[in-house]
């Protein structure tokens, strides 16, 4: 049960964070997925020096947030330690919410992000065409920083979002044996656009598959990615950390 996993991680929060700090993790971004989480996510960040927050509505929850007011998202996004907008985007794989509702909220998040110049954290699954169409249309109204998180899309989609100026974050999926297409694309992402993440509590990388994913497991994904790209772990850690602070510019190193 996902809820049980998240509660377990929250209950063990300090131990989980300490394990990550022990392998060199310097900062954490706790991403919200629905409005009911915002206060807790932001509150945790405000109490913990190296933890930051985002506010947003995951596309799975678009239907239950059909009445979300722009002013509410804007006010929450102005909170202390809030450094990003999201997770938002489109998910046509599960289709848990009406697609038009997903599109509406995606655009609303972008609008707030553009005003505050905070990066949009984008989830996209089986929705490449509509995601690109919205990104191109919204970029035409004025630039905004953005990140495709937990990238699993096609190389063509990846190149198009790079051409739009977005960054791409790679999760533990890249370590999976059947992720050959992702591995090939991950080799080609420019150094100044690449980030690494866990998507905790999901998608634990090899050698932790089947376990609850923790922030510290980013070390395993980064190690694999560095080897894949023919780079040293120190080099990859240095430039992906630099990219994080450049994109999430409200965070302080």
Question: Positions of the model-derived regions?
Answer:
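Mid-domain alpha/beta scaffold segments of enzyme catalytic cores
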Residues: 1-253
């Amino acid at each position: 049960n996902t809820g049980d996993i998240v509660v377990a991680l929250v209950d063990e929060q300090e131990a989980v964070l300490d394990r990550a700090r022990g392998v060199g993790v310097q900062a954490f971004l706790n991403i919200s997925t629905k409005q009911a989480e915002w206060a807790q996510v932001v509150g945790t960040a405000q109490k913990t020096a190296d933890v930051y927050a985002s506010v947003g509505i995951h596309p799975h929850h678009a239907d239950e947030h059909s009445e979300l007011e722009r002013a509410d998202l804007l006010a929450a996004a102005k909170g202390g330690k809030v450094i990003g907008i999201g997770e938002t985007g489109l998910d046509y794989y599960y289709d848990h919410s009406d697609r038009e509702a997903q599109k509406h909220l995606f655009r609303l998040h972008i609008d707030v992000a553009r005003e505050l110049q905070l990066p949009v954290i984008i989830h996209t699954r089986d929705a490449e065409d509509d995601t690109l169409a919205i990104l191109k249309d919204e970029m035409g109204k004025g630039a905004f920083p953005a990140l495709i998180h937990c990238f699993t899309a096609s190389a063509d989609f990846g190149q198009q979002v790079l051409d739009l100026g977005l960054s791409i974050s790679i999760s533990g999926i890249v370590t999976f044996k059947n992720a050959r297409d992702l591995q090939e694309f991950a080799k080609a992402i420019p150094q100044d656009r690449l980030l690494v993440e866990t998507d905790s509590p999901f998608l634990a990388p090899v050698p932790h598959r089947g376990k609850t994913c923790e922030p510290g497991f980013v070390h395993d994904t980064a190690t694999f990615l560095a080897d894949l790209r023919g780079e040293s772990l120190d080099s990859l850690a240095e430039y992906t950390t630099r990219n994080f602070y450049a994109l999430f510019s409200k965070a302080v190193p």
